A protein has these predicted regions:
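Short, well-structured N-terminal submotif of metal-dependent ribonuclease cores
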Residues: 1-37, 46-59
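Alpha-helix capping/helix-boundary segments
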Residues: 10-11, 41-42, 70, 90-91, ...
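A general structural signal for well-ordered alpha-helical segments in protein cores
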Residues: 21-22, 42, 51-54, 71-74, ...
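Conserved beta-strand segments of alpha/beta enzyme cores
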Residues: 34, 62, 120-122
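Short beta-strand scaffold positions
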Residues: 37, 65, 86, 104-105
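Short, hinge-like loop/turn segments at secondary-structure boundaries
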Residues: 52-56, 81-82, 120-122
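Acidic catalytic patch
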Residues: 61-81, 107
Length: 126
């Protein structure tokens, strides 16, 4: 298994206690793969301190900051892919930098952004 980056759809599904998401997350952790979550994805999903399942998922992830360099890459990807979703662009930029796959519920937009990044990562649909 390779590294993975989670998008907002994964966090939302985990917060809703979707069993398949939790099962796949556990398999990754047992294989020694710590999923990466860009901090802007957390911003997009976090609404309340009572989101226990969200915080539980994030405790098994590496939440990475949005660096200035990654922000510039994400901005270029938005232009190249003709996309408007800033958070998806950060997900794609992070995946490209880490040479990671992306777990997403937004296949089409992530695909365009990964293609714009000329990234080799695969998309794993929710």
């Amino acid at each position: 298994m390779t590294s993975v980056v989670y998008d907002a759809g994964v966090l939302i599904a985990a917060d809703r206690d979707t069993r398949s998401v939790w099962a796949e997350h556990r398999v990754r952790l047992e294989a020694g793969i710590v999923p990466v979550v860009p901090a802007p994805v957390v911003v997009q999903v976090s609404r309340s301190p009572t989101q226990v399942q969200l915080r539980r998922l994030l405790s098994g992830c590496d939440v990475v900051s949005l660096t200035e360099q990654r922000a510039h890459v994400a901005g270029r990807l938005l232009g190249r892919a003709d996309s408007r979703d800033v958070v998806d662009a950060v997900v794609a930029a992070t995946a490209a930098e880490l040479r990671a796959d992306v777990v997403t519920g937004d296949h089409a937009d992530i695909r365009r952004l990964l293609d714009a990044a000329e990234a080799s990562g695969q998309i794993i649909d929710l």
